[in-house]
Amino acid sequence: MAEYRLAMNAFESASWNCTSLILPEQPAPPAWLVRVETGLGKSHVGKAMIAAALKANPVLQIDYIVPGHELAEDVVADLAKLSVGAEVYRGYKQPDHRPGAPPEAKMCLDIAAYEDALKCGANVRQSICDLLGEWRCTLAGKCGREAQRLKRSRVWVYPSQTLYHKRPDFIPEADLLVADEKFIGGAVDSKVTEILLSDIAAVAGDYNGALVDILQESPGRRPLTRSTLVAKGVTADGARRMSKIELRRADVLVIQPGMAKTQRAAVVRDRGRSIKHARHMVDFWSEVAAFLDAGHEESGRIWIADSETFGFRPLKPVHDSWRTATLILDATAPSTELLSAVLGLHVEEKADIVAHWSPYVQTRQITGAQVGMRALGIRSDEKTGKSVIVDEGKRNRSDILRFIQARAGLIHGDVLVITYKTLVEEWEQAGGLPNNVRLAYFGNLSGLNDFENVAGLIVIGRLLPPVLEMEALAAVFSGTPVPESDRTWIERKDGTKRLGYAMVDGGILTASGAVVATKMFQHKNPTVEALRQLVTEAELIQAIGRARAHRRTRGATCRIDIVCDIPLPIVVDTVVPWDSVERGALGDMAGSGVWLNNRRDIEEAFARVSEYWARDAAKQMGRNPFKESILKRDFSPSGPASLVALPRRVTYQRAGERWHTNTAFALPHGPQDGATMREWLEDRLGPMAHVEVERLPMKHSALALAMAAKSW
């Protein structure tokens, strides 16, 4: 972590030079990106440096940005341990955490008024809280938002969405802003704003008339072009003037604090739509001006949807009121170009810090598994847009479930499984997972520290965002559509073509130095590719980072399975094909704590297992006898194996002359002595003539594992 500390010290010095004397001619404040591999403790070190800086500078004010409110609470708790007082900034609809507040209480006690203000696009505080000190909400004395305004702290912690709104006026300007993890997601609205012909025509003006003509003369859906605007006499300066005119029309207070609900409803009905349209037009004309200034021929943010509608999706950079020295800490940060566009400052990458993983972690990447969302039967519902599970893919889902069961049966301790949210929800509802399995899903991983002590981690699948969505997003960030030459068209079996990602050669790097060839997704356009990587590779790295592989010791080993073909910027110990891993009937047997080796005995002892899967399990067991078992293959005897509870070999013979001696394995959570093993076998297979459980050396036993965990 020495490199990280040096970067932090250098940033502190640079930011002090920026903030020590505030003069108009001073240069823009520094904005630094420090990439720190997940699990290295970047947040902990960053908070320690903040504590030291606050102690050294008694007037220093710091803003700390995290992805959400839950993580904000964790930051405040962590800073308290360092004797630093901090406050979480809470929005109107957030829970009120004040002592004595009802559990269901929100920060705002009149959410209906808040939502009415939003419908009008109004300034919320002036509309429903306090207007010039003369009109106040009748609930102000009990309100969590008003109580929050009285708080004072040198460190405020905010959810990242707050960056895209004006900074709270009651909090002193910050000298430093620390952004811990991603924040660019709030820069682009998920919904498209529609600018309707009827709303444009309702307001007089030459430029509005030009917009009406552009819509009515359009041959169909297409981007708004520079040549079209120039032909209609629209200039950048004229667009800026129109934005100011619309601002005067929009900046009208139509709702006041204390207004009755019926009055507000009438205002929303009569004036809300026109005022909100005016606010949209403020942004629309500002974007037209920026587009003409930029020199692009086609706009990536404004398009003609049809003869009566403009589609508009602006880039919302971080609000100017947050402009100060900024430090970005992120293991999977986007490119500095994207960060600069959103932050409004030139971002420099100052460090990219990686670390060696502990030798007490073994990583296996499993290729060739059918783990894409489509292969697993995960679809988007046409009506709701939500992901749902369909019958197609049932076989693949069953294979994955049985693999998890088999793997969890081999691991002494909790196993974290990370996969798609829809699949996690189905498993939570249907059950069937071993008791030592915990679940998490992609898209909800940043900053989570709940799983740093799991004994196993299984990452299944990968997110792959739709190409059209990523191209549309890239168009917003860059300001111009993706060129046709950057797109890849893939031919279907029926001869038609679909838009997709190119499949290019890639390689998975192993500890031996060998590279295992694989294929990887790639988009030709660098902005689209950067955005895709934030969803695919970055989320996989976040998932793997939950195991905190750098911090493992002899008493806290971990086995990581990555079940997908995507090459990642990590070194894995082994790469194996899906067909060779423990799964099928081994998963069905794992819950009982015993793996049988004989096909007929498997069928008899486990009613759910068919002849095909029983034969497959016997084949797997024959391929992986105890001396070369999956467990020993993962952990060499000279390494962490001495502290892993290995399966015990069991030899048994059923009563009667026609039965031969067979082999089984007692898993770490299964029967561990002759008496319980005999009972297990006789319950399922009938009387036994002979049962013998192998005695393991003390170093391989579960007891040794528990003792080691306490001593290290």
For each predicted feature, which ranges?
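ASCE RecA-like P-loop NTPase motor cores
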Residues: 1-712
